Curated annotation (Swiss-Prot):
PANTHER family found in the cross-reference section: NADH DEHYDROGENASE SUBUNIT 1 (PTHR11432), NADH-UBIQUINONE OXIDOREDUCTASE CHAIN 1 (PTHR11432:SF3)
One Gene Ontology MF term: NADH dehydrogenase (ubiquinone) activity
Natural source organism: Euphractus sexcinctus (Six-banded armadillo)
Places the protein is found: Mitochondrion inner membrane
Protein name: NADH-ubiquinone oxidoreductase chain 1
Tagged with keyword Isomerase: no
GO cellular component: mitochondrial inner membrane
Listed GO biological process terms: mitochondrial electron transport, NADH to ubiquinone; mitochondrial respiratory chain complex I assembly
Length: 318
């Protein structure tokens, strides 16, 4: 029975991830005044399936001087972690209702750094190594602000359980009282998922494709799938944290529809940002975090910690 639950969670995520690749190509196409994929199937709808078949039947080549174990382990770890991050997500019921769901998500997203580091180092290529080092520095840096923002939200929520956020936001979405944090959170999720304008790891002009430059076929597809699964997961988390999904006991099915719609809109914003902005320079990326976001989030976190003490109230303060 539990295996069935896991399959019911994983299969829709994989389908959503597959069609997100198509949506991205379509949206970028229309923004650049062209059609995008429109040959495979009606309106190009079967393109992701064709891509998957093509990638998984190709021979997975490996550089002669690479570390065999780490080279194959890294993409598997990346994809496993990307799927595991969904375990505590309330949609409306999580797979496992964890007391410390927020800490679980933070811990697993930190572990994802290892897969990037291993893939860059095991490839034995200078492009892959530089790309991996950049990705690790970027991910670790932005996780600091993500953790502080999450702490502020948990102060408003009163617990580390994600499921209670729905109750907290019954009367008002947390995006209204926490809008500076929400903006910084959204930008940090862009950096955390290595998306434009923060895709320094795969600067085509200098690093070819970044840490996955030596990968081909199946292992490359796993990295690709992990990236897009993480994008949907981050947007689902943003929806849960700031745009508390509609909760009505009379129409429980509306919760999921509402949740999916908000996640989709946020994902479209990711794609819109990608189509609109040029890439940041590496030093600008680090300055933005350490000199702008970190002091601001720390100040706001102190403010949210002091609120219960001042008002002598118990969270949620809504």
């Amino acid at each position: 029975m539990f295996l069935m639950n896991i399959l019911c969670l994983v299969i829709p995520i994989l389908l959503a991830m597959a069609f997100l690749t198509l949506v991205e190509r379509k949206i970028l196409g229309y923004m650049q005044l062209r059609k995008g994929p429109n040959i495979v199937g009606p309106y190009g709808l079967l393109q992701p399936i064709a891509d998957a078949i093509k990638l998984f039947i190709k021979e997975p080549l490996r550089p002669l001087t690479s570390s065999k174990l780490m080279f194959t382990l890294a993409p598997t770890l990346a994809f496993t972690l990307a799927l595991s991050l969904w375990i505590p997500m309330p949609m409306p019921h999580p797979l496992i209702n964890l007391n410390l769901g927020v800490l679980f998500i933070l811990a697993l997203s930190s572990l994802a750094v290892y897969s990037i580091l291993w893939s860059g180092w095991a490839s034995n290529s200078k492009y892959a190594l530089i790309g991996a080092l950049r990705a690790v520095a970027q991910t670790i840096s932005y996780e600091v602000t993500l953790a502080i923002i999450l702490l502020s939200i948990m102060m408003m929520n009163g617990s580390f359980t994600l499921s209670t956020l729905t109750t907290t936001q019954e009367h008002m979405w947390l995006i209204f009282p926490l809008w500076p944090l929400a903006m910084m959170w959204f930008i940090s999720t862009l950096a955390e998922t290595n998306r434009a304008p923060f895709d320094l790891t795969e600067g085509e002009s200098e690093l070819v494709s970044g840490f996955n430059v030596e990968y081909a076929a199946g292992p490359f597809a796993l990295f690709f799938m992990a990236e897009y699964t993480n994008i949907i997961m981050m947007n689902a988390l943003t929806t849960t944290l700031f745009l508390g999904a509609f909760h009505n006991p009379l129409f429980p099915e509306l919760f999921t529809v509402n949740f999916i719609t908000k996640t989709l809109i946020l994902t479209m914003m990711f794609l819109w940002v990608r189509a609109s902005y040029p890439r940041f320079r590496y030093d600008q990326l680090m300055h933005l975090l350490w000199k702008s976001f970190l002091p601001l989030t720390l100040a706001l976190c102190m403010f949210h910690v002091s609120m219960p003490a001042l008002s002598a109230g118990v969270p949620p303060h809504m």
